[in-house]
Amino acid sequence: MGSTSSLYAAIDLGSNSFHMLVVREVAGSIQTLTRIKRKVRLAAGLNSENALSNEAMERGWQCLRLFAERLQDIPPSQIRVVATATLRLAVNAGDFIAKAQEILGCPVQVISGEEEARLIYQGVAHTTGGADQRLVVDIGGASTELVTGTGAQTTSLFSLSMGCVTWLERYFADRNLAQENFDAAEKAAREVLRPVADELRYHGWKVCVGASGTVQALQEIMMAQGMDERITLEKLQQLKQRAIHCGRLEELEIDGLTLERALVFPSGLAILIAIFTELNIQCMTLAGGALREGLVYGMLHLTVEQDIRSRTLRNIQRRFMIDIDQAQRVAKVAANFFDQVKNEWHLEAISRDLLISACQLHEIGLSVDFKQAPQHAAYLVRNLDLPGFTPAQKKLLATLLLNQTNPVDLSSLHQQNAVPPRVAEQLCRLLRLAIIFASRRRDDLVPEMTLQANHELLTLTLPQGWLTQHPLGKEIIAQESQWQSYVHWPLEVH
């Protein structure tokens, strides 16, 4: 195949799972084409002399035969295969890698723990929104990476010898989910963390991001149970008590926890509790990408943008031919409304960002059809890949777009968990009003307005005589007041 291919592949031979990511480069960003993950549990095949068993190696090779079929379509220069903790440790890693290279037809690189940490950080920096100064945590099968950084630059990198597979074999070997086993696992993890904790705290962070299967599992549990998606020590302790209550690993049942993730969940949970405790982490969210994304973006030599969300919104506006001027116009009106009521409603900066994002995409449904455009918009946003936005934030955006006009579906605003239900209602009200007053699609036709909030009552003051001079506008606003009143949102217009 010619080297003009836009396909790239990244393969990560992890201690618990092997992963393959195949992407296509599209206008400076990546479009995911294939994700394959297989639980190989390589680390479980290490004996006391750190030799890999033949069975574990065979499981790995079998998985790579599946991957090899997909790699035939991609130029070798656009494939990167890396091996991590278990193959750093195994005394017979050379035997495994020689055959792996033969199967895949390309080199396999065993990377150092620091290089693994750097790549994980790059993957997060390219795909995850939020504050610029971050702490990234990745709990693997046999190692845990902790990285601090600002923007694209790392400030400290650590790869520690503990992982969910090795801790499972060491502290939950009897498969008992007893308090003593958790205590021993947490104590050992804290001892591993202690030598690096001061340096991590010295560099500091504004946001903490988790980039591993353990954190993914926690996110799935919390979404399934209707909680908000922020991981806190309190929630981790509750899940630990739930696990202890189940008694044994084979009887572990928690809403939202898949069978595939259950085996290494308690050991991963113990490590995460130790990290939260030792580093005094307040809350953590899930990263948009990690090691494989870091490999791909490294091959593409793409720079890390300061604002991932803005890049995502720009790409989608281009792809769906959204009228960018109109999106900006609505966003400007919405931002003005938000700034006038934020103190009375105690709204946070992230809510403003999410409202502006909804404005940028509010006409995406028109790319399908004018009829049911809000439903089309909600469907598209729910199902598009939106780097920089968490799953809960995507759901909120979809819900706001569903309710941008026509009667309000209050239950949908209450089913999202990115923000409290009351905040979702408030953002929805501001979006609807902004769309109405920017509907003439000209900056000079947007009236000067003041918006005041008094508890749930919104009072909108228009220029004198505006309602008389704009009979259609008056009718639309009267209809909007009626729709808002149906869901007990009082709106007065003067």
Curated annotation (Swiss-Prot):
Its EC number is 3.6.1.40. Keywords: Hydrolase. It catalyses: guanosine 3'-diphosphate 5'-triphosphate + H2O = guanosine 3',5'-bis(diphosphate) + phosphate + H(+). The keyword Hydrolase applies. GO terms for biological process: guanosine pentaphosphate catabolic process; guanosine tetraphosphate biosynthetic process; nucleobase-containing small molecule interconversion. Catalyzes the conversion of pppGpp to ppGpp. Guanosine pentaphosphate (pppGpp) is a cytoplasmic signaling molecule which together with ppGpp controls the 'stringent response', an adaptive process that allows bacteria to respond to amino acid starvation, resulting in the coordinated regulation of numerous cellular activities. This is Guanosine-5'-triphosphate,3'-diphosphate pyrophosphatase. It comes from Escherichia coli O17:K52:H18 (strain UMN026 / ExPEC). The gene is gppA.
